Every structure is written in structure tokens, then in C-alpha cells.
Amino acid sequence: YISVTGVQTCALPIFSEKRGDTVHIDVIDRHGNMVSVTPSGGWLQSSPTVPGLGFCLNSRAQMFWLAPDLPTSLAPGKRPRTTLTPSLALHEGRPTLSFGTPGGDQQDQWQLSFFLRHVHHGLDLQAAIDRPLFHTAHFPGSFHPRTREPGSLMLEETFGVATIDELRRRGHRLTVTEPWSIGRLTAAKRDPDGLLRAGATPRLMQAYAIGR
């Protein structure tokens, strides 16, 4: 017997709400073949059937602008600006690194932070993923209603008081979040000697790094 009055909903909406969303996968096999994919779309949920035509637009087709004479204006043969950024990096012409994340307009921002930390600052995959993350909503959103927040910056509080205070002094409109709350990054790498490495964010307990 379960008392209905005793049932409580999950305090974290991100866990209590069950719905489909973007995912990201990085895979490297023993031969060095690599794949980086970011399946997304949700077109059955987010795009109605086009009247008289009988098919849906995938969600990235929503990124077309209906105003004329823009680079992403809706027109035959054109592709819209897309947020999906599954990435492969080469070293001396050889595939070396596969990485990516879900996250809409934040994907490029989070991935650039990871890539620079790994390649230019020498952090290993997991350390580069674990470092604090940030993103901005200054640019108009890719999805309707295409809102923007000029000068805004969201960052994890683990950047530290000095950094946060300096950003405010420079005029950024900050939203400071809890630690381990921004980013969904994963990455896999093949060393020149064939050793395979992987890293996955612990944020929200949604990502895994697995080898066999």
C-alpha cells in the first residue's frame, strides 16, 4: 500500500522530468577508427506536420529565419546555422581526438574551453572536462523565440571570487551557478602508440567513459 499523500516529487527538475533530448557519443575502436556523433532533432515532438505535404521539419530546420535577405533565411538548397558540433581533431594528419557535448547554443562554447585546456594547457582529458565552465547568451538564440541577453555570462562559482569580481568590474552581467552544473562534455583519444583514453563529465551523473 502506498499513500498518495506521502509521495514526493523529485526536487531536481532535470531528474524528475523524463523526456527525449540531445545526446553525444565518442567512439574509437582498436584499429583507430573514430566517430563523434550528436544525435538530436526531436522533430516528432517539436515540429508539426507541414500542411499539405505530410512531413515534419527536423528541429534544426527551425533555425532558419523567415525574414528575407539574411544568411540563414529560409530558401531552397540552403542549410541553417546549426548548434550540433560533433568534433574530431587531427594531429599530423592522423585522427587523434573525438569530443563533443549536448547543449544547444552552448556546445561550441563548452567544447572550445575543453579543447584549449587540453591542447594548449596540457590538461588530460578528464582534467580538461572537470575544470569550471562558462557560456554566454549574448548572441541571439538559435531556437524560437531567439531571445538574447546582451552582456550576460553564466559561470560556475568554482572560478573563484577574484575572477567573478573582476568579470563584474568589467561590466559582465553574471549568473553564478553551483559547482558541477554547466557542461555535458565527453572525449576519447588515441595516443600515437595506440593507447586509448577517455573522459566524461561527472556533472548531473549522465555521462560515462567505458573501455574494453
Predicted feature residues:
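Proteins synthesized as precursors that undergo proteolytic processing into mature forms
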Residues: 15-179
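Structured loop/turn residues at beta-strand edges in well-structured enzyme cores
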Residues: 5, 93, 183
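Single conserved hydrophobic/aromatic residue that forms the stacking wall/gate
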Residues: 1-10
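In a subset of proteins, long, contiguous C-terminal domains/tails are tracked
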Residues: 161-212
